[in-house]
């Protein structure tokens, strides 16, 4: 899988930009705030229907325009895909794949698979459980439409349950019984799929991490949930919802479920979030990202596109070398402010360089 070309109209700081990409390594060089990350953002949006930088689609539209247009042409082994997206300031958007209108975001996912690695991804390790849940949910939604459906349903019912808790009486108690049964069904599936994904990360990630650290470190991922028996997750969840209902009423929120879960990343049996050095935390994220690439490849038979947003300068020479030696079979799109540090690791025959300046791109 690789992107042949991208066409942007009124997207961020681009007026009308058409870009041909190499199926191998593409490097965009320029100072900060020139539009490098905007290119990656447009590709990411074409993959999952949302930005990695903002929750407001109108932020993607050039400030003096009423809409933006994105076209991404994707070469696939079986069938090429042309993804067209129109986003309007009034909040509406229209998406087609090979000229067929997309009604749900789940229909967009899987046409273009990408893995994004940016400096902000360090939050997956360092920050709150919400960042780790978001990582799992995004990766699972890319490869599992049922997961996407059940996650949407779970969050919808969870919101309704929380609203009901604020107005609790005997009649609403019966309604909450129904919510609890639905949440248990969808929540059990989410928990089991997350745990399975972490099992895959453990198998693949351990080998990757050992390569990066020259066998000096062992990494482990462990799902943190109240569920003890995954085979009976639905029954356990239902029991917890009923048991905690009074407490939930007092707090006006649901205190247990996959929306509260977390996962632990440990290196040599030490919690990386609390005790890991910044170098170890970066390496853990690197492992997560490259393991995600392999998981997608194992499921769909093709590598996704790898997006590296100004991260190579954050890595030491050994980690830079690992990254650039691992992408020979993967279309990779890199942004950076200079290539001096990584130039010695690049395969010049497989690399295409672009200069970015104030929304203008020049192929070198």
Curated annotation (Swiss-Prot):
Annotated coiled-coil segments of the chain: none
PROSITE patterns the UniProt entry points to: RECF_1 (PS00617), RECF_2 (PS00618)
InterPro entries: DNA-binding_RecF (IPR001238), DNA-binding_RecF_CS (IPR018078), P-loop_NTPase (IPR027417), RecF/RecN/SMC_N (IPR003395), RecF_2 (IPR042174)
Domain of life: Bacteria
Localization terms from the record: Cytoplasm
One GO term of the biological process aspect: DNA synthesis involved in DNA repair
Molecular-function annotations in GO: ATP binding; single-stranded DNA binding
Keyword terms: ATP-binding, Cytoplasm, DNA damage, DNA repair, DNA replication, DNA-binding, Nucleotide-binding, SOS response
Annotated GO CC locations: cytoplasm
Xref: CDD domains: ABC_RecF (cd03242)
Keyword Cytoplasm: yes
Binding site for ATP: 30-37
NCBIfam families per record: recf
Function summary: The RecF protein is involved in DNA metabolism; it is required for DNA replication and normal SOS inducibility. RecF binds preferentially to single-stranded, linear DNA. It also seems to bind ATP.
Name of the protein described by the UniProt record: DNA replication and repair protein RecF
Organism field: Clostridium botulinum (strain 657 / Type Ba4)
Lineage: Bacteria, Bacillati, Bacillota, Clostridia, Eubacteriales
């Amino acid at each position: 899988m690789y992107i042949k070309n991208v066409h942007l109209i009124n997207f961020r700081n681009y007026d009308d930009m058409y870009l041909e990409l190499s199926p191998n390594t593409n490097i965009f060089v320029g100072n900060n705030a020139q539009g490098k990350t905007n290119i990656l953002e447009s590709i990411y949006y074409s993959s999952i229907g949302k930005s990695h930088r903002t929750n407001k689609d109108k932020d993607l539209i050039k400030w003096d325009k009423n809409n933006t247009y994105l076209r991404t042409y994707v070469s696939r082994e079986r069938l090429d895909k042309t993804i067209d997206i129109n986003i309007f300031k009034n909040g509406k958007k229209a998406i087609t794949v090979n000229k067929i209108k997309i009604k749900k975001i789940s229909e967009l996912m899987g046409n273009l698979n990408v893995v994004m690695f940016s400096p902000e991804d360090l939050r997956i390790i360092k920050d709150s459980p919400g960042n780790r849940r978001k990582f799992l949910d995004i990766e699972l939604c890319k490869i599992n439409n049922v997961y996407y459906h059940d996650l949407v349903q779970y969050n919808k019912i969870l919101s309704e349950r929380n609203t009901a808790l604020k107005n609790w009486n005997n009649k609403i108690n019966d309604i909450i019984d129904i919510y609890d049964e639905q949440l248990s069904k969808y929540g059990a599936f989410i928990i089991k799929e997350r745990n399975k994904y972490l099992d895959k990360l453990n198998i693949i990630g351990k080998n990757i991490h050992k390569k990066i650290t020259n066998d000096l470190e062992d990494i482990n991922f462990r799902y943190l949930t109240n569920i003890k028996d995954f085979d009976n997750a639905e029954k356990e969840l239902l029991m917890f919802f009923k048991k905690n209902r009074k407490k939930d009423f007092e707090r006006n929120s649901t205190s247990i479920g996959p929306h509260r879960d977390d996962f632990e990343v440990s290196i040599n049996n030490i919690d990386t979030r609390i005790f890991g050095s910044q170098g170890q935390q970066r390496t853990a994220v690197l492992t997560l990202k490259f393991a995600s690439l392999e998981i997608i490849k194992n499921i769909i038979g093709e590598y996704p596109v790898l997006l590296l947003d100004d991260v190579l300068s954050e890595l030491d020479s050994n980690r830079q070398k690992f990254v650039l030696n691992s992408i020979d079979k993967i279309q990779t799109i890199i942004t950076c402010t200079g290539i001096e540090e990584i130039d010695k690791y690049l395969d010049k025959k497989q690399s295409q360089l672009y200069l970015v300046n104030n929304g203008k791109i020049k192929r070198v």
